[in-house]
Amino acid sequence: MDDALHALSSLTAKKRTTTYKKVAVPILDENDNTNGNGPNDIDNPPELTGNGFLFANATLNRVKNRLEGKKAPEQNHNNGKDRSENSLPTQLISNLYDGGEELEKSEVKDNSYSEKNVSSSFTQTQRIPVSIQQDKVFNVPIHSVNDGKPTQLIKEDGLVNETSQALKTPLTTGRPGATQRIDSSGATSQTQPIKSIEPQSQIITTSSNHSNALSPKIPIIPTELIGTSPLFQSIQNRGPDTQMDVPPQTAHDEDKTQAIGIPQATHQEQKTQIDTVAQTLQDEVPHTLKIREIQSELASEDSKREKARNVEYKKPQKPIPTKKFFSKESFLADFDDSSSNEDDDIKLENAHPKPVQNDDELHENKSVELNLTDETRINEKRVPLLSSYANNLKREIDSSKCITLDLDSDSDEYGDDDMDSIKLSKDESVLPISQLSKATILNLKARLSKQNQKLSQRPNKSKDPKVDHNVLLNTLRKASRKQILDHQKEVIETKGLKLEDMAKEKEIVENLLEQEILRNKRIRQKEKRREKLEENDFQLNAHDSGSDSGSESSGFALSGNEIADYESSGSENDNRRESDSEKEDDEIILKQKKSHHVKHIINESDSDTEVEAKPKEKADESLPKRIAINLGHYGDNIGEDTDKFQETNVLDTQNIEEVMAERNTIENEVKDDVYVNEEADEAIRRQLIDKEKLQLKQKEKEHEAKIKELKKRGVTNFFEMEAEESEDEWHGIGGADGEGSDDYDSDLEKMIDDYSKNNFNPHEIREMLAAENKEMDIKMINKILYDIKNGGFRNKRAKNSLELELSDDDEDDVLQQYRLKRRELMRKRRLEIGDDAKLVKNPKSSAFFESMVEDIIEYKNPFGAEEEYNLDITSTATDLDTQDNSINVGDNTGNNEQKPVDQKNKKVIISEDFVQKSLSFLKSNNYEDFETDKELSRIQHGNDEAIEDLYTLKQNSSIKSFTNSQTDSTTSKTVNTIIDLEKRPEDEDEVENGDTSLVGVFKHPSIIKSFASRTDINDKFKEGNKTVKILKSYKTVGSSKASITYMGKTRKLIAPKRKTEGSHRYHHDHHNKKMKMKTKTKSNKLFESGQDSFDN
């Protein structure tokens, strides 16, 4: 007992944890005692029993029988065996409590079955979905056997004409008190989620031993999947029913079969059940058990939770963008079709009135309409919310793209145009297409114009008023201000104060400040009046003194400039005074100060003002003292102390004023003397200016009188004619004749500075100019010294100027002489190196040194002084010391010069012709013309500073070829050419040169000859290695640095052997013959040997 009650108490808490168990349901026989529901019980669902239900359990039945005092009936084991054999698979229903599996081990032995052999075969199962969200109720009438109606008519709402069938339902009889009525709402969690299966037909065949008729197989019509079909829901008095169990129906008849098709209902997932449960007749059980109410409430709560959980979100499908093409003809055709369809519909409704129907017909039509509306609702509910929302949006978008034309609905507003349009619409079928389109267009225009007029007359309520940002800002400021004030008010009230009292005090203070400002203004006005009186008195005194001294300075004259300056200065002073007074008033108002106690020191001469001021002071004293600031009830407490404090202040201020008055009197006595003199000068100046003005006015009057007299005489006509002729002759180029007009022009005099008024000190000006010149000279000297130290002049040499800012011709000549002298000095310093210099001895470094020397040479005559560098290269057939057989070079030029060969430096000399033939590619075609031009240039310009041109440098270059002992003499060319750069004797030059008178005077020693190497070339091959000597130290030559720019790898070379006289002669003749035969060959054949090379 305790275990059973404990299982019932745990029913509500652990309802969700379910297990599933297959239980066989027996097939009942017709002969069994059945207790069906009467016709009054149509509203209640069929009562179900079986091993899978809660209250059909054996243990519960035992407990119930014991409580009621009844004995448990005997169980028939044989019937149990037959029942188990013939039982069919029933619905998979979970236990509603823990420990249900143990209780169901002892299965209840239900109602007795007949011993008839009933064979049943189920070919296929049926998917029966049940909706959770549907609130409608199916009332399945079950007719008992006692009524004589063995069949029941089942009609479902989901199917109109196909789902109703005559079913023969043999009902089973149960034991009294053994069965319980189970509320459909309590079995919400007994449903089993099963994957969706395609709706299939069910065929149930039953055979009986006592029946001779064969039962036909009736296939069930497959039904559509409808999302919200109601099935077996609760009674009206009960809560929201979500029963998902199928009403158990069995077909056990010999001649009858059942084909059941139940529509499907899904809540986001298709739920199926396979359920065949036998109907039983139950005893009357009270329906007012408390546990059933609790179960119904829990089931409704669970259903709500499942609804909230099972809501799925689906993305709205984006509309596929499609281009819509609109044309005038299609639009008009659609418009005409729509208007004609509407007219036809109206005519059909009027032509076919609705027939009068009876009450029965009305009732049947209503049921049919209800079924149709249920179907449409089901179809509508199948569509998810998001997809429907997306479809609505698409419709709105499509409608916005189209043009909507609203017709005038009011019949009273139709005019003649509308009537014409109606006539046109009637005659549209008669008119051709072209006329039809024009008519419709005109009709549309008329309608739209009327519609626009109506819209313009109506107030635009839909349009939002324009939002002004300034208004919004003002509202925000007001709101924020109000919020701040409220906050301040709360803070002040918390402190125990009141804003009203504070506002009153603030008003009082503001009123007092305004009174103070007004009082200060009055005081200032009084002071201005006094100042004006003083100025008037001062002007009268000055005028009197000026009249006395005017006679003394009558001979003193003033210019027109002084008069104009005085007038302008007077106007400026007046303007300044006015502006100062205005500024002072503004400052008083802004600063809100108290009264300024201005002290005026009155001289003895101003006795009248003192007399006027005294009665005013007395009148002020006689007036009662006005309280400037009303302190309220606090003023009485401060009164006595303030009187004492004022008395002490008055005594102190009187002492201070006496001391200040004494000082001011002494200062004023000194200033008055100066001021009187200045006043006298100004008065004299005014008088002179007035006199000058009178004189100018008199001159103008006299001039005008002269012009009037000339006009009367007729002289003006003659003058006009002359003026016209002069203008026509010169066209205004000559300008005005004669002196200028005598009229005074003040504007010009203002523009011109009058230095007579300025007092300049010439000594100060001279000192300033001298100081400026001195500074400039110091800067220039410092610059020159800096350039001398750091080589600034050397850098400026390329610009051919020292930047001394000297522009005269004489100074230019001096600069040229300076440059010449400087170059000569540099040249001498470089030539002092002499023959012992290592740079000159080394042929590789000598070229670099020569380039440095060439930087100093002036290029005045680059081609004129070549003759002194013409080298006499002769071929020696005998000893090198002999000069008899020397061949003179330069036969074309006529200047054949012979040079003695130094005995110390033994050299091999060859002729110039040989070198020219061997190096023909370096020689130009017009060589003779070039030589003649060179001679003429030498005679004309002289050879002060000669330099060789590119042609002579190439011509006088040296070529060396080294021969190995293994190579043939024919293939290898042993040509040793060297430049003879020795100085020629002056005697031979004078004898052989016929032009000594022109050239000899300007002749200078050659620069390049002094750097010629006097050593033998073969000396450096004595050791067998070609070496280069490197100097780590360097020598400065004319502020420049000498260095070695060539580095060579050491290589072993065989020095050439000195040849005899016979070999030299043979070698020379042999080469001459070869070169004569090969004059027309190409120049590149000179370098057939890879060992030939140029070397300095």
Curated annotation (Swiss-Prot):
GO terms for biological process: cellular response to osmotic stress; DNA repair; DNA replication; DNA replication checkpoint signaling; maintenance of DNA repeat elements; mitotic DNA replication checkpoint signaling; mitotic G2 DNA damage checkpoint signaling; mitotic intra-S DNA damage checkpoint signaling. Residues 591-600, 1065-1083 have a biased composition (Basic residues). InterPro entries: Claspin (IPR024146), Repl_chkpnt_MRC1_dom (IPR018564). The modification Phosphothreonine is found at residue 609. GO terms for molecular function: anaphase-promoting complex binding. Residues 488-542, 652-716 form a coiled coil. Transmembrane segments: none annotated. The keyword Coiled coil applies. Residues 336-346 have a biased composition (Acidic residues). It is found in: Nucleus. Keywords: Coiled coil, DNA replication, Nucleus, Phosphoprotein. Residues 547-560 have a biased composition (Low complexity). Phosphorylated by MEC1 and RAD53. Residues 68-90, 166-200, 294-316, 336-365, 527-620, 724-743, 881-903, 1058-1096 are annotated as: Disordered. The modification Phosphoserine is found at residues 144, 409, 411, 434, 605, 607, 801, 807, 911. The keyword Phosphoprotein applies. GO terms for cellular component: chromosome, telomeric region; nuclear periphery; nuclear replication fork; nucleus; replication fork protection complex. Residues 68-85, 294-315, 611-620 have a biased composition (Basic and acidic residues). Its main location: nucleus. Interacts with CDC45 in S phase. Present with 721 molecules/cell in log phase SD medium. Required for normal DNA replication. Phosphorylated in response to DNA replication stress. Phosphorylation allows it to mediate the activation of RAD53. This is Mediator of replication checkpoint protein 1.
